[in-house]
C-alpha cells in the first residue's frame, strides 16, 4: 500500500483526531482524486501525533515539530510502519522527509525522487499541501501541479511493484 506521512495535526486535526481534515486535507484529496486515488486506497498519518503550536497574541499557531517532539513520537510512527508495511511512503513536507528519508532533506531540490528506505520499498517526498495553500496565482498552480505529479509517481511506483510481484508468483 501507499502510506502518506505529513508533519503533524493542525487545529482541526487536533480536534477530530484524524489527519488532513482541514484546508490542506481538502487540497490533498483533490490532488489524490486527480490521480484516481481516494482515502480508501491509502493510509495517512503524521510524524508527530500532537499539535505543535506556539502562542501569538493569545492565538495558537501551527509550527514545525521540534526534533525532540519528532523523536518522542517516533516509536508510534515506527509501529505504524511495521503494521502497515507500505510499499511506498509519500512524505509531505520537509519535516516528514527529514524524519523518514534523511536528515537535512532539501524539499525543493530532492522532492519527486525515489529513495530506498528500510521500512518500505521506496520513499518519495512532495510539497506539503499547507505550503501550497500559502502560494498565490501562478505559483499556486505550479506547486499544486508538482504535488499532483509526485502523487502520480508514488501511485505508479506502487503499481510497478505489484506487477513485479505478480510476475514472480507464477
Q: Language model features by range: what are they?
A:
Residues 1-170:
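A polyanion-binding, active-site-adjacent surface
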